[in-house]
């Protein structure tokens, strides 16, 4: 387990629900990656992320799906892509990412607490 944090620290993390609207391969990345655009509703808008999720996910099975992401992460340039959010997932025994998503359809932009 990682170091414990206080509620005040956790409360600073802005985690939201969004819907994937586009997916394409990041051809410049050293490791197979996808550039994912996610709609987080009116308040936050559309944000993009570069994610190493190609083992289980593709444009065909990811577009239209809802995901959970950290929306106030500092932007990072990853292989020519400005990654604006961090899409959340669990990591299986082989190191492959399994995305976290709501169990029911949710409004884009709803906060996770």
PLM feature spans:
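Phosphate-backbone binding interfaces of nucleic-acid-interacting proteins
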Residues: 1-113
């Amino acid at each position: 387990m990682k170091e414990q944090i206080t509620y005040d620290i956790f409360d600073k993390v802005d985690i939201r629900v969004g819907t994937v609207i586009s997916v394409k391969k990041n051809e410049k990345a050293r490791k197979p990656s996808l550039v994912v655009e996610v709609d987080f509703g009116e308040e936050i808008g559309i944000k993009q992320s570069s994610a190493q999720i190609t083992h289980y996910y593709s444009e065909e099975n990811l577009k239209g799906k809802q995901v959970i992401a950290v929306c106030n992460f500092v932007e990072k340039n990853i292989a020519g892509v400005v990654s604006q959010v961090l899409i959340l997932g669990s990591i299986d025994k082989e190191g492959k990412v399994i995305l976290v998503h709501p169990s029911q359809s949710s409004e884009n932009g709803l906060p996770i607490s």
